[in-house]
């Protein structure tokens, strides 16, 4: 089963890294 929370964190991490 896919975990929405995990996908949400992954997206945030990518955005954060790009922003930094």
UniProtKB/Swiss-Prot annotation:
Residues 1-20 are annotated as: Disordered. Keywords: Antibiotic, Antimicrobial, Fungicide. One of its GO terms (biological process) is defense response to fungus. Heterodimer of a large and a small subunit. Possesses antifungal activity against P.infestans but not F.graminearum. Antimicrobial activity is not affected by salt concentration. This is Antifungal protein 2 large subunit. It comes from Malva parviflora.
């Amino acid at each position: 089963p896919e975990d929405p929370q995990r996908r949400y964190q992954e997206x945030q991490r990518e955005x954060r890294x790009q922003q930094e």
